Amino acid sequence: MDYKTSGVDIEAGREFVSEIKQAVEGTHTSNVIEGIGGFGGLFRIPIDSFKKPVLVSGTDGVGTKLELAQSKNFHFEVGIDLVAMCMNDIITSGAKPLFFLDYIATGKLDKNQLLRVVKGISHGCGENNCSLLGGETAEMPGFYSKNKYDLAGFCVGIVDEDKLINGKKVSENDLIIALKSNGVHSNGFSLVRKIIQNNNQIDKEFEKVFHLNFYDELLKPTKIYNNVINQMLTENIEIKAMSHITGGGIPENLPRCMPSDFIPYVDTGSWEIPIIFKFLKEKGSIPEKDFWNTFNLGVGFCLIIDKQFKDPILNICKDNEIDSWEIGKIVRKNDSTISKFLPEILT
C-alpha cells in the first residue's frame, strides 16, 4: 500500500501548488524576497518608513459559513471572507497590512474548488496591497469528509507605536460612525443553517417576495475596510477607536474598543436593517436579544471620532462607495441616558 492508496495524493498537491502560483505571486509586493515553494515566506519589513514599528497580527476563519458556501459552490467568495475576517481585525489598531498566510485542510484535494478559494484569497490580498506570502494545504482523509474543507488565515500588519489606535483617547460625546456591511458577512451561520433546515422552501419564498436570489444575498463576501481606513489615516483624520462588528454583533463588539467607564449610546433608528436580516428573523422566530447579539444587522465596522472629523469621514466613505452614517455617541456609564441604549439587549 502506498500513500496515495491511503488517501493522500502528493503529486496532485504539487500540481495544485503549480496552478496557484500565478494568483499568489500576483499579490507580491517589492518586500517579498522569494516566491512560493520555500519552507518559510520571507518578507522585508519596511522599517525605514516607521520611527518605532510595531507588528500587529490576527488570525481567524470563516466558521460554518463554509458548510453552506461549499454546498452552493461559493468558493471564490469564502477566500475573500478569510482575508476580510483577519484584515478587518488588525486594521482596528491602525495597522497597514503587510502579508497574509492561509491554511487549507481537506479530506480530498479538489483542485477546481480550492483553486477558486486561493484566487479569492489572492483577490482579497491584492485589492489591499497585502502579499499572500505562503500557506499550507493539508489533505487529511478520514479526518475531513471527501468534499469538505476548512480554512484559517493569518494576517500581519505594521504601525508606528505612537500612532497605535487603542481606544485610550475616547471621551464623552465622541461620535460613533457606522460603515455599512455587505450583508451577513461571516458570523451567525450556525443559526442561519438551522433556519434553512427548518424552512425547506426558504430560497423560493425570498425570491418571490424580494426578487433576489437568496443565496447570492446570504453568501456575499465580507467587506474589507482596509482601503477606506487607510485613506482616512493618510489624510490625518484622527480615529480614536475602531470596532470590527463580528460575532456578538454591535452590543458585544462596540464596547470592546473603549475604556470601561464609557459605553456606546446607539440610535437603533438611524439606519434601516437590511432585508436579509429581517427575513431570517421572521423565518427563524429569532428573539430580539439574539437577533442583535448574533448578526451585524447592516453595520460592518465602527469608528469613534471627534465631531470635527465627521464630514471628512463621510465624504471619504462616499468616494469609496461605502455607505456611512452617524450611529450614536459615547456616554459615561453613570449617565442617566444609559437606560436608553438597547435596554432589551444589554440588560
Swiss-Prot record:
The keyword Ligase applies. Its EC number is 6.3.3.1. It is an enzyme of class 6 (ligase). It comes from the Bacteria. Transmembrane segments: none annotated. One of its GO terms (cellular component) is cytosol. InterPro entries: PurM-like_C_dom, PurM-like_C_sf, PurM-like_N, PurM-like_N_sf, PurM_cligase. GO terms for molecular function: ATP binding; phosphoribosylamine-glycine ligase activity; phosphoribosylformylglycinamidine cyclo-ligase activity. Keywords: ATP-binding, Cytoplasm, Ligase, Nucleotide-binding, Purine biosynthesis. Pathway: Purine metabolism; IMP biosynthesis via de novo pathway; 5-amino-1-(5-phospho-D-ribosyl)imidazole from N(2)-formyl-N(1)-(5-phospho-D-ribosyl)glycinamide: step 2/2. HAMAP family: AIRS. This is Phosphoribosylformylglycinamidine cyclo-ligase. It comes from Prochlorococcus marinus (strain AS9601). The gene is purM.
